[in-house]
Each structure stands twice: as structure tokens, then as C-alpha cells.
From Swiss-Prot:
Residues 1-60, 355-413 are annotated as: Disordered. Residues 385-399 have a biased composition (Gly residues). Transmembrane segments: none annotated. Belongs to the adhesin P1 family. InterPro entries: Adhesin_P1_C. This is Putative adhesin P1-like protein MPN_144. Residues 1-13, 25-54, 355-376 have a biased composition (Polar residues). It comes from Mycoplasma pneumoniae (strain ATCC 29342 / M129 / Subtype 1).
Amino acid sequence: MGQQGQSGTSAGNPDSLKQDKISKSGDSLTTQDGNATGQQEATNYTNLPPNLTPTADWPNALSFTNKNNAHRAQLFLRGLLGSIPVLVNRSGSDSNKFQATDQKWSYTDLQSDQTKLNLPAYGEVNGLLNPALVETYFGNTRAGGSGSNTTSSPGIGFKIPEQNNDSKATLITPGLAWTPQDVGNLVVSGTSLSFQLGGWLVSFTDFIKPRAGYLGLQLSGLDASDSDQRELIWAKRPWAAFRGSWVNRLGRVESVWDLKGVWADQAQLAAQAATSEASGSALAPHPNALAFQVSVVEASAYSSSTSSSGSGSSSNTSPYLHLIKPKKVESTTQLDQGLKNLLDPNQVRTKLRQSFGTDHSTQPQSLKTTTPVFGTSSGNIGSVLSGGGAGGGSSGSGQSGVDLSPVERVSGH
């Protein structure tokens, strides 16, 4: 039970992952494999702290080659989703909108005050409270660091740092501890991975055998019939920021991101655009931060704001990433209900099926030949978690055929 470090399949390395040996400078790595007799090809990661031990072959280790390996799925999702904090903020006037002190992180924090339920109030994943937080801004963007909330043109997007609100949106980690139980409709198809996260469908492409750490990320609105639902590419070259993953002593996968490459792309774009002037140097490097390319497709969302005197203002040039653009609403209550409907698990599943053109199918047509990582049907983790398995028949907690226990408890087989 308590053995660790003696076996290659300990909690710290449940998949017997090969590891790199890192020099003290952090930039000279050679592959090591205790069972290997031949020379292994070196895997090079730059800018890694010397005390980190990344996997020598992270794409292979986290590629779901064995699609029924729940431990591997957990490692990947914990490492990936653990670095994506998102915030859901309520709309309203200054006196009615959520302040930082109002942001509740769990259902128990809310006590009986449902009006401050600003996280899972807008959506659950397979019946579980969704700990995601996605900060929302309405109407005016974050120009000058003080955008106002209106309910006439709502949109969900990433927060722009106060100190650099004219450049890009960033997510600073570590965020909430995402687990596979928070994710639905997880499927692997060819060289891509897709899963449902709240009201979004997140897809990772070309990650099975990426080139030098390539990781293509894209976020799509679930309503494919709505012209306002646009695909968003997370950073122009996300692989320029990735520096490697490793398994820590608790059995969790952690990742290092260096934003200099992404910043360079955005600085180049900024130099070519008259509406943006900030460079990446305005943001301090953070080993676990992930920058996002500014979206400029919603031109109408960046129209000049109008002051109380009626004169136009051209200060509304701050970049603002639209993830989901709900229908126009006229009141806070209507917006709240719209967001609840948008992120409702049943709505999400319906829209997923619609987006793949199979309204009456239990699984998207293009995914019918794939095998979801959890369970044997269309990825409804709720029944698996309850012990019913994919078919929902059995009642024992071990009957689902998939081990969903935390990674820390992996015993080595």
C-alpha cells in the first residue's frame, strides 16, 4: 500500500513514464529509461527549472493510446484543466454586479444566498457542480480597466489584466483542481481530443504525435446553427508556449508554459494593427500562465462607446475574447436564465448532437467509431460516477469498468 519510488508504476509514475534527466542549468536534458538498453533519442525542453522532472515522451505518455486507461486520462486532464481557471460573473449595474468578494468557490460557501451563486448556477457538468468561473463583461470592453456592465449586448470572455488591458487576455494559474469528473463527452478521434467543459466544446488537435510539443487548441460555441458562434483558436502558436509536462510525487501531471513565443506573435500582430500597441513585455512571465490570441472577428462588439453627453468615444479598443455570445437580452433576470439554459447539460448534449448533424442519435455521427475514455457509450459520466456504468444498470461502485479514483490513490497497476 505505502510503497512509492520502488516501482516504476508507483503513485508518482503510474504509467511507468520515461523521464528526462535535467542539468542544473535546466536546458540540457537526456532521456533515461531504466529498462532500456539502447540509446534513446533526447527530448529537449528549454527554460525548465532544474528541479522539475518532465516525461521524456509526454505526447506518447498522454496520448490515450490505450483509450480505456483511466489513470492516463486523469493524468492528462488534471495537468491540462488544472491550469485553466475560468470565472462566471453576473450582469447588472455597478450595485448589482458581482464583486471579487462575492465570488463563491463552492456550494457550501453560498449557504442560503442563491443570488451569489456565480459559478455552477450557470451550468453543471453531468449533474455535478461545475467549479469553473468565466468572467463576463457586457457592452463596453475593458478599455481603461473599467468597463461597464449592460444587459443589452452580453458576451462571455476572458478577463484582461488590469495593468495591461490593451494587449491580451491571460489566465494565470494554478486554477481550480479540475478532475475528469468535471468533464463530459470525452472522446478521442484520430489525432484529436474533444470534451465538453460547461457550455463549451474544447478540442485539442494534433496532440497524439505532436511535433516538438505542438498542441493545437480550439474552443467552439456549441450552437453551430448560430452565425455568432465562432471558433476561437487559443493562441496563434500554442506550442510556442509549451515547455513540457511531468508527474509530481503526488501522481499529478504538471506543465510548464513559457509565454515568450506567444507574446512575440502578438507583439508582431500589434505592430501591424493600428488598434493595438501593447507588447508582451508588459506582462511578467509566469511558468504556468497561458496567453490567448486576441479575437477581432466580432467587429460590432468593439463599437465606440457613448458618453452620457452623447459624444462618441474611441477608447473602446481593448481586446476582449468572445467565447459564447448569448442572444440579446433586456434584463438581468433574462440574462441569468439564458446563461442557465445555455450551460444546462441537457442543452449541451443536444447542441453537441445537432452540431454533428445527428439530432436523434445518442452520439455524434462523426464520433461513432471512437471510444470515449470513460464508459462504453456516449460519455455520460454521471451514470458512471453513480456506479451504474455506461449502461446505467449496476449499482456497485466498482461496476462501471472505469477507475475514476483520484490519481493520488493510484497503487501501481
